[in-house]
């Protein structure tokens, strides 16, 4: 009997493939692992629950006793320090790359009294040259932690910046530290006092070989609308109608470049500057006499958002310790469904043609 095999170049259809698969499974079910490996190790995958003889037997237990020596460490892959051929996308310089919001307790000097230890959120970034793949971000944290036990000032931040610029071989760098700073504030008339918390950030920037020391402060105050105040008084005087002017909680964010050659600009100094410019700071502890006093204080200092920006500006211009600055104010209207906002800048540091779309949305008080 002569057998005429089918043309092996013929493309099988699905039924032919299913038949061949069934044949392989029947054969593999009775074959040894050696026979399967000799034919093709992948055939073993056709068997349900069959161990794959070509797959390594890996441990699933965490090796608690394993230790890393210098030789092992040297052999670990380091993709971020790889060749430029590994770069994905455009080979372009990155101005800022690093880590944001790593937190630790930091000790700060006060103008008077003992130092304070405050939970601090740190952001550290460096520039990345066009031909470099990436950075080892943990080095930023390690460099910062070398100084974490010191009482912080701009001088200590500079030392930390020097360390991680050296460790990461970068030419530009930035450190920003955010924290909530408490100050005990006395009530207007009752003699009570309580802690007011101020959102403060210290920022040190090295760019093009020059360093800038920047302090940011959020100041929360009450703004009484001058127009609403006059309209309310008109209703009272002309028609005997009781009316209430609208006022609202408002926030100003002051960002100032600190003159490194001048005397120290304390946190308390910048807070006092804000209070001189706009004295209607929100209160902490109040009794009835304090609430009445606050109403009188607001009536004596009605203020549009334009006024706020210029009043802060006047105080900032008068302080020789302050260079360039920016004032961003937001009056969160009780009359309108929208906010009234203003931005005033002095000098080139904060001048920009574009604003962050979320800038004004960040100006709110967290109780």
Swiss-Prot record:
Site (May be catalytically important) found at 225
Coiled-coil spans are none
InterPro entries assigned to the protein according to its UniProt record, in alphabetical order: GTP_cyclohydrolase_FolE2, GTP_cyclohydrolase_FolE2/MptA
Instruction: Tell me which domain of life the UniProt entry assigns to the organism this sequence originates from.
Output: Bacteria
Key words of the record: Hydrolase
The record's GO molecular-function terms, alphabetically, read:
GTP cyclohydrolase I activity
Q: What does this protein do?
A: Converts GTP to 7,8-dihydroneopterin triphosphate.
* Family classification: Belongs to the GTP cyclohydrolase IV family.
Name-wise, this protein is GTP cyclohydrolase FolE2
